[in-house]
Amino acid sequence: MMFSSIDSLLKISTSSQNEDQKLESHPSPPSQIPNYSTSCSEELMKMAAKAAQFAAQASLENSFSSSTSPTSTVTPLSAYTSLVQPVLPLIYDHLALTYSVNAWQAWGKMRRPRTAFSSEQLVQLEKQFSDNRYLSRPRRYQLAQQLSLSETQIKIWFQNRRMKNKRCPSSTPIQSTSSS
């Protein structure tokens, strides 16, 4: 990351020192359980900000130490991994809940509740089915709006009604055809 001026470097280092002093005045125990009420993205944003401050401070310290000594100091990897550790329990716990041993058994048993159509809705659906066994998309949309149902519910009802008609043809409503 390139900085536009030395002033911006100094602002970052002084702001990180101020934040370090604030953190030192309110020490938190190292075994503190992470707050699960905040979202994962918020945690990642906080960690990215801490990492940027840490990297800026480390590069600033390295630039000063390289001017005083011929060898540059290398920051150990453990200093960076300590920034990542608070998020790992969030991710692990989420995955543990999602992919637990018995989750697949419970997932197979979960079903949407059966839609209970009102008598008015059934009369209208049966009337439409007697006119035409297949609905066009615009007609399905219009019928869904009229009956306060979703298009998917209308589509599934028509599929089920066609299968019922196929199994027992006597269930088809008699179409009244007038001869003139």
Curated annotation (Swiss-Prot):
Null mutant phenotype: Causes abnormal ectopic expression of homeobox protein vab-7 in VB motor neurons. Suppresses the inability to move backward in an unc-4 mutant background. In an unc-4 mutant background, expression of innexin unc-7 in puncta adjacent to VA motor neurons is significantly reduced for posterior neurons, probably as a result of miswiring of gap junctions.
Tissue-by-tissue expression: Expressed in VB motor neurons in the ventral nerve cord.
Protein name: Homeobox protein ceh-12
GO biological process, one term: negative regulation of gene expression
SUPFAM superfamilies in UniProt: Homeodomain-like
General function of this protein: Transcription factor. Plays a role, downstream from homeobox protein unc-4 and Wnt signaling, in specifying synaptic inputs to A-class motor neurons. Involved in patterning of the synaptic outputs of the postmitotic DA class cholinergic motor neurons.
Chief localisation class: nucleus
UniProt keyword annotation of DNA-binding present: yes
Organism: Caenorhabditis elegans
GO terms under cellular component: nucleus
Pfam family, one: Homeodomain
An example Gene Ontology molecular-function term: DNA binding
